[in-house]
Design a protein with these regions (language model features):
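N-terminal Rossmann-like NAD(P) cofactor-binding subdomain of oxidoreductases
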Residues: 1-191, 227, 260, 291-292, ...
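Charged docking surfaces used in two-component/phosphorelay signaling
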Residues: 67, 157-339
Length: 339
């Protein structure tokens, strides 16, 4: 089996290489692609040197079984036909195709079977905040239909990329040395010692694109009429996103029921003993595969409400790991010929 990573030099591309090696993903050859800036770079994968090729409109994907694409929406749209024309399965981390009717939007713990229906040869990876939330919501949905969700997200600097993370570190340095953050480029305001209640551009309804992704993607993934209202906030941590989630169900459910289903849910680690200061924090979820969940409690404002807190590594489960799990599911179902 032959796999490719498009955008190999980026944060998600690098994480993909680590995860493919960690999980002993069954490939004979890994091919790396990138822009003119990264072409020629060399990375090691399972003891072998892999040189990044320039991504071009040619036949380079002819013998590739699966391509993990993490190079931005523009590149995904531009190269989708080139990547898929010979039957390569394209697992795309951008937002380019997520809401297309003929492209499945997949979180394996929730709707893995959707990946088998892909008329264009493309499977979309959801937004990182959506992925982490629906992994936790799906077991609760089995207890009672979820009608409404309110979310406040606390999203780390690395969610905006490696350059954004470096900018945050530079701001802290400047503040310590001069008392003023002079480097403000990736964010609309100083992020160091601050929070910014805007991620992505504003839409006509005064929600951001990030917030609308959570509304639309959750419904598509869960095949549900659930209504989601989000406020997405950039915080000055480096890695892992967190979410405060309020859930209203059709029928009453208890905190004990929720804890029980989440304790055994795939992809979830339950950390919920706040009297002993045990609850999820982004610092400990960084570099981990699971979504951590805790602070589960009965909502005081509605009879059928549950409130909880979750955190997870947005580069791993929020992007790279989810993509690899999709490919693993296709292998399990016999979609690839393993040599």
């Amino acid at each position: 089996m032959k796999a490719a990573i498009v955008g190999a030099s980026g944060a998600v591309g690098q994480e993909l290489m680590r995860i493919l090696a960690e999980r002993n993903f069954p490939i004979d050859e890994l091919v790396l692609f990138g822009s003119s800036r990264s072409a020629g770079s060399v990375y090691e994968f399972k003891g072998k040197k892999c040189e990044v090729r320039l991504l071009q409109h040619n036949d380079d994907f002819k013998d590739i079984d699966v391509a993990f694409v993490s190079a931005g929406g523009g590149t995904s749209k531009d190269f989708a036909e080139t990547i898929t024309k010979y039957g390569t399965v394209m697992i795309d981390n951008s937002s380019a195709f997520r809401m297309d009717d003929d492209v499945p939007l997949v979180v394996p713990e929730v709707n893995a079977e959707d990946a088998l229906k892909r008329p264009r040869g493309i499977i979309a990876n959801p937004n990182c905040t959506t992925i982490m939330m629906v992994v936790v919501l799906q077991p609760i949905e089995k207890l009672s239909h979820i009608k409404k969700i309110h979310i406040s997200s606390y999203q780390s600097a690395s969610g905006a990329g490696a350059v954004a993370m470096a900018e945050l570190q530079q701001q802290y340095k400047e503040l310590i040395e001069t008392g003023e953050a002079k480097t403000i480029s990736k964010f609309p305001h100083q992020l160091a010692y601050n929070v910014i209640p805007q991620i992505d551009l504003m839409t006509d309804n005064d929600y951001t694109k990030e917030e609308m992704k959570m509304f639309n993607e959750t419904r598509k993934i869960m095949h549900s009429d659930v209504r989601t209202s989000a406020t997405c906030v950039r915080v000055s941590s480096l890695r892992s996103h967190s979410e405060s989630v309020w859930i209203e169900t059709a029928d009453p459910i208890t905190v004990e029921q929720v804890r029980k289903v989440l304790a055994t849910a795939p992809g979830v680690t339950l950390k919920d003993d706040p009297q002993k200061y045990i609850y999820p924090m982004p610092l400990e979820s960084a570099g981990k595969d699971d979504v951590y969940v805790g602070r589960i409690r009965k909502d005081l404002a509605t009879d059928n409400g549950i409130t909880l807190w979750l955190t997870g590594d947005q580069i791993r489960k929020g992007a790279a790991l989810n993509a690899v799990q999709i490919a693993e599911y296709l292998i399990e179902k016999g979609d690839f010929k393993i040599v």
